[in-house]
Amino acid sequence: AQTGADAFGGPDAASPDFSPMQKAVNFAMTSFLTTGGIRGGSADSMEQFKPRSFNMGCKRELYLSLGGFSEDMRYGEDIDFSLRLFAHGAKVLLFPLAAVYHKRRVDLSKFFRQVMHSGEARIDLERRHPGSTKLVHYLPALFTVFCAVALFISYGRGLLFLYALAILIVSTGINQSIYVGLLSIVTSFTQLIGYGYGFIKAKLMS
């Protein structure tokens, strides 16, 4: 209340006792190298911070006046609510130290489907909130197309190798584990391609 915030949120983080795969998934979802830092609560992220349902607070009267979460949305309802907060002129603050340990799916096929649905939801969000899709949301789709093209171009494969190497180095440094670093390559590619595929699929069907 002392901050004057109408709504607030914080980053998601990995607890030290998370499994290696949980830490790798967290890296894929929060690193600047993968999502532009928009989920990690970084002031240097590529998009304005928007609270997500796993770490969000809002004044009750404001929540009710906006109608709460959209019940007709299966995915992306928290971002939809955050966008409505901004459209309403609410004061939304990021509390960088108010992190939540967020356990995500560690089964790669389920993780792929989860991020694929997030990519699909982005198209729905753009339909509801024109102009809300930023460059960072297009990057996974571009990456997905690039991966397909790189299969036939040697320098493309070289660039993907350098990107994977960057993920390995950064994640290993953050997690103090080369094993987590290696897993982060897998989870990062899964995250980007899954989201990109869902984004492209929904865009073509819209």
Predicted regions mapped to residue ranges:
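Membrane-embedded multi-pass helical conduit in multi-pass membrane proteins
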Residues: 143-206
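Short glycine- and hydrophobic/aromatic-rich loop-to-beta-strand nucleating segment
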Residues: 48-61, 67, 74, 79
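Catalytic donor/gating beta->alpha subdomain of glycosyltransferases that bind UDP-sugars
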Residues: 70-133
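Short, flexible, basic/aromatic active-site loop/helix in glycosyltransferases
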Residues: 10-16, 25-49, 53, 64, ...
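A generic structural signal for short hydrophobic patches within well-formed alpha-helices
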Residues: 62-63, 100
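Conserved donor NDP-sugar-binding/catalytic core segment of glycosyltransferases
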Residues: 1-31, 91, 97-99, 103
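Basic/Trp-rich segment in TM-proximal cytosolic loops or flexible interdomain/linker regions
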Residues: 109-161, 178-181
